[in-house]
Regions:
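Asp-based, Mg2+/Mn2+-dependent phosphohydrolase catalytic module
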Residues: 1-7, 95, 99-102, 115-206
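Short phosphate-binding/catalytic loops that engage adenosine nucleotides
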Residues: 35, 106, 183
Length: 206
């Protein structure tokens, strides 16, 4: 085994192909108030941010009163859970990768800008929850990605140094957080890049 002792996974776009779900759910909530995010802006400006931060950004560029943000956020979470119930399914290559890495002795964690309830629901439906040693959500930190706090806090909870951790990330905010944390980075383009072979190859290169 390499000197890596833990593998830290982002969730959306890494373990779960959920970017479109968040886009659909947020716009469903926003449309009730005459607002909408384009698909381009969601990918290039809002990708990887917590809903609270997305709404704060929207408030600066459009007429979206601050007093509506919490209500819209709650609506968005409700719509997201409805979509998860319909669409979130296990992906064999992820089950195989995490189960094998777990057997090999690696600590496994999910570090996501999503809410804890959403993470647990997705991980249960993807049949990955049993392999995780730790779940970190946006509710566990003061500053979400691109701030590295979530990764630094995870490393401390696992009692590990940054150089002992491999982080899998897919978007600019997550990648910035991973790099700033000092951990090793495996950049992911799609959820299908997350497989045992790719992770093992990266581990052997460290």
């Amino acid at each position: 085994m390499s000197r890596i002792k833990a593998i830290l996974f982002d969730m959306d776009g890494v373990l779960i192909d959920a970017k479109e779900w968040h886009y659909e759910a947020l716009n469903q909530a926003l449309k009730l108030f005459g607002c909408e995010i384009s698909r381009f802006d969601h990918v290039h400006t809002f990708d990887g941010l917590p809903t609270k931060d997305k709404l704060e950004l929207l408030g600066k560029v459009s007429y979206l009163p601050t007093e509506l943000h919490e209500f819209i956020n709650q609506l968005k979470q409700q719509y997201t859970m409805e979509i998860i119930t319909q669409k979130c399914k296990p992906l064999f290559q992820h089950e195989y990768a995490l189960s094998r890495l777990k057997r090999e002795g690696y600590l496994l964690a999910v570090c996501s800008n999503s809410k804890r309830k959403t993470i647990i629901e997705m991980m249960e439906r993807a049949e990955l929850l049993e392999y995780l040693d730790l779940i970190m959500s946006n509710e566990d930190v003061e500053k979400a990605k691109p701030n590295p706090e979530i990764y630094i806090t995870t490393m401390k909870k696992l009692n590990l140094q940054p150089e002992e951790c491999l982080i899998l990330e897919d978007n600019k905010n997550g990648i910035a957080a991973a790099i700033a944390s000092g951990g090793h980075l495996l950049k992911i383009d799609t959820v299908y890049d997350v497989n045992y072979t790719n992770i093992r190859t990266k581990l052997q290169s460290i």
